[in-house]
């Protein structure tokens, strides 16, 4: 039963990770179409706020090339980390792939925001509803709840995704 839920969480989480990573990589390009406060909010969603508060503005000066540089840099970093881990741990090819996905899931949550980026876009869309008497008050209560719910579910799905990957390579047995 847990195996089935973990697989569903894994597949959903990969979609969110790829989507939010794509948003961040294209942020220098689409930043001109978004309000500046939304762009700055996205860049402050993760653990590396200090790095990205300097990195994203510099990359945005180069437009799409800045996004590509960030993507290529991330890919090189994943490749180097994977080869180092594989040589130390003496892993098979399938285990290397699983380790890469686990590392990518974790790193994407911190560097690219992952579920936090999704929550920000959802709550900003809810916040941009045309002002209707009484609706603004309701939205001010609902938006933080939705944000917290998405963050909690996102964290749970990341854990389930990692458990699923570890079970696929035989390190963990799920019921």
UniProtKB/Swiss-Prot annotation:
List all membrane-crossing ranges: 14-34, 58-78, 101-121, 142-162
Annotated keywords:
Host membrane, Membrane, Transmembrane, Transmembrane helix
| Localization | Host membrane
Q: Which GO terms describe its cellular component?
A: host cell membrane; membrane
State the membrane topology.
Multi-pass membrane protein
**What is the name of the protein in this document?**
Putative transmembrane protein ORF175
Q: What lineage does the source organism belong to?
A: Viruses, Viruses incertae sedis, Bicaudaviridae, Bicaudavirus
């Amino acid at each position: 039963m847990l195996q089935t839920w973990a697989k569903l969480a894994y597949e959903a989480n990969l979609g969110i990770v790829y989507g939010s990573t794509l948003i961040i990589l294209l942020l220098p390009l689409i930043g001109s179409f978004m309000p500046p406060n939304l762009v700055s909010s996205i860049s402050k969603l993760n653990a590396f706020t200090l790095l990205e508060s300097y990195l994203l503005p510099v990359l945005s000066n180069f437009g799409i090339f800045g996004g590509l540089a960030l993507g290529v840099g991330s890919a090189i970093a994943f490749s180097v980390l994977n080869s180092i881990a594989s040589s130390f741990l003496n892993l098979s090819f399938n285990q290397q792939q699983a380790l890469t996905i686990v590392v990518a899931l974790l790193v994407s949550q911190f560097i690219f925001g992952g579920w936090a980026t999704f929550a920000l876009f959802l709550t900003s869309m809810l916040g941009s509803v045309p002002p209707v008497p009484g609706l603004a008050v309701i939205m001010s209560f609902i938006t933080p709840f939705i944000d917290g719910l998405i963050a909690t579910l996102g964290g749970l799905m990341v854990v389930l995704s990692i458990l699923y990957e570890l079970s696929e390579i035989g390190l963990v047995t799920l019921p």
